[in-house]
Structures are given as structure tokens and as C-alpha cells.
Amino acid sequence: MTTVKFKYKGEEKEVDISKIKKVWRVGKMISFTYDDNGKTGRGAVSEKDAPKELLEKLEKK
């Protein structure tokens, strides 16, 4: 599966694209929420670093 690598509060994180629930654009950044073992995690990645699967989820909404 495809994963998204991002930094959140200075910490490197990686999340599987299948766990991502909601995706939206903020300027040139792609923000998203994901299922973090029952909790809701948040993340953001620049548009140029986002995998194409994440961009496809953005287009579908």
C-alpha cells in the first residue's frame, strides 16, 4: 500500500493511505485526517510531495 510521509509537531510520521478519512487543500498544502488506532490524527504535506493517491482522494470529494 501507499504511505504518506509527513512531519507533525517536529516528529516524522508515516500513515497508510487507506487510513486517511478526509482530505482538503490549504493553499499549497494538502491537509488530512486519519485513523490513528481509534483516535483521529491530523497531518499535512506539500502539494509537490503528496503521493498521487492522496491527490486522487482530494479530487473525488
Swiss-Prot record:
GO terms for cellular component: cytoplasm. Highly stable from pH 0 to pH 12. Keywords: Cytoplasm, DNA-binding. The keyword Cytoplasm applies. Pfam families: 7kD_DNA_binding. It is found in: Cytoplasm. Residues 45-61 have a biased composition (Basic and acidic residues). GO terms for molecular function: DNA binding; RNA endonuclease activity. Hyperthermostable. The keyword DNA-binding applies. Can constrain negative DNA supercoils. May be involved in maintaining the integrity of the genome at high temperature. Monomer. Belongs to the 7 kDa DNA-binding/endoribonuclease P2 family. This is DNA-binding protein 7a. It comes from Acidianus hospitalis (strain W1).
